[in-house]
Amino acid sequence: MQDKDLSTLQTFKRLWPTIAPFKLGLIASAVALVFNALADAALIQMLKPVLDEGFGKVDNSLLRIMAIVVVLLIFVRGVTNFISTYCLAWVSGKVVMVMRRRLFRHLMYMPVTFFDQNSVGRLLSRIVYDSEQVANSSSGSLVTIVREGAYIIALLTVMFYTSWQLALVLFIIGPIIAVIIRIVSKKFRELGKNLQNSMGDLTSSVEQMLKGHKVVLAFGGQKIEEERFDQVSNNMRRRGMKVMAASAISDPVVQIIASFALAAVLFLATLPEIMTQNLSAGSFTVVFSSMLAMMRPLKSLTNVNAQFQRGMAACQTLFALLDLETEKDTGKHVVDTVKGEVRFENVTFSYSGKEHPALNNISFTIPQGKTVALVGRSGSGKSTIANLVTRFYDVEQGKITLDGVNIQDYTLANLREHCAVVSQQVHLFNDTIANNIAYAVTEKCTREQIIEAAEAAYAMEFIEKLENGLDTVIGENGASLSGGQRQRLAIARALLRDSPVLILDEATSALDTESERAIQAALETLQKDRTVLVIAHRLSTIEKADEILVIEQGEIKERGSHQELLALNGAYKQLHSTQFNH
């Protein structure tokens, strides 16, 4: 138990620096709570002269003064309750936003191995739900005490049972409160819908980044994703504050109206018609105290600790995620341009948890401006080779060089700046076609450059037929486009990037023959004067490659040109015969 308490204390201490920048909100809330407590104390104290002197002996003018004071005190209580609730909600919203942004940035720089081992849904839960729980632990518990401490509606029954004459005042006040609640409820529905939409935007933004993590890494899109997420997270925070403001302001309004019921009870108690009904001091005290008690329910206090512990548990989970190492980026080498020679030297690599290596002592060279194709059965290690070039994974043994420099000596951003990737699984963002193509470049590009890239990729053929052309929003992951169209946008993106090293990872394997022919010319344009690594499923697409490597079980079994490999009458010839005899 002591260990648990210590862990909770340590977790909160670590969380405090996140809360500290917003401590003015906490101070304002605390001051408001002090005045709120003083108002409550004054209300209770006002019962003393009534009980001390006896109900029938109190000067009527004193009761009339007390009626005015009650209204003022309840007004103060309502205002301070609103200030306290709003300030705490402001702090809570800020803490949530900071935690979400920190998690989002951290996830964008995590290695691919991390995403291999963690589901997208779980990560979304960390960002969206767990961060909310952290806010509940830091300030939400106090919000619960303030807000939930304002009501015990059950005391209304006690009031009517004790003195229905005095409690009858509520029949006048009740309809007014009902109207307010109806108006506020309608507003809540509207605000709630807006908040749900914001939650959808937030989840969509995170999901796009997570699903397209390789694209973000390969094209250096972290800044774009960060700005996009900053915007949607702030929109959600502001809409959340509107919901909280509406909730917080409705409480004091109802309380202020209820205070008129208190004043009315005091005035009615001075009337002879009421005085002659044998209204005892005890009955009066019960009715009056019950009205006060409606503003101070305590039943939710027992849940505060549980709420705090849930928040701390979520906080520990998030800190554990933030403590995970991001991609290793220890390289210092930065160059503006490279020639593009890629060399594998005795490279061995194994995936985590796998018994056998995915690559075993691989060595080959892709000279500047040449094309090397990798062929082999599924799972032979072809895609692993491509992933190693961009350092989505790091080699265990051996090394990979770019222009004679170990790729681990380059900074990650600089290495990936020199590489363009077109893969089988094209990831497009829920944005315009123009922005999807321009995603490849870190600096701003002109409309003409985008059009030029689209034309070179033979994408303008279908883009011009769309109603909004380049400004067409294509839906999540390009849902409104065909496979061939999506692939041509990926090629246009790579053309615009204009990197000297090009990786084509089974770029046509998922397309039908007609679509494949449509983009083959685009691929040939893309490969011109570039160092190209092609992972091919269809051998017809790599017959012109300068060298073809046949990969089996992580090793190079054969190498040579198309004609040379056919002449060997080995594994390549068998693959070729299998495809072309069907």
UniProtKB/Swiss-Prot annotation:
Residues bound to ATP are 376-383
TM stretches of this protein: 24-44, 65-85, 140-160, 161-181, 252-272, 274-294
Q: Which UniProt keywords apply?
A: ATP-binding, Cell inner membrane, Cell membrane, Lipid transport, Membrane, Nucleotide-binding, Translocase, Transmembrane, Transmembrane helix, Transport
Q: What is its EC number?
A: 7.5.2.6
Stored InterPro entries: AAA+_ATPase, ABC1_TM_dom, ABC1_TM_sf, ABC_transporter-like_ATP-bd, ABC_transporter-like_CS, ABC_transpr_lipidA, P-loop_NTPase, Type_1_exporter
Q: Which cysteine pairs are covalently linked by disulfides here?
A: none
Where is it mostly found?
membrane
CDD domains annotated for this entry?
ABC_6TM_MsbA_like
Free-text comment about domains: In MsbA the ATP-binding domain (NBD) and the transmembrane domain (TMD) are fused.
Protein name, entry field: ATP-dependent lipid A-core flippase
Lineage here is: Bacteria, Pseudomonadati, Pseudomonadota, Gammaproteobacteria, Pasteurellales
| Name of the encoding gene | msbA
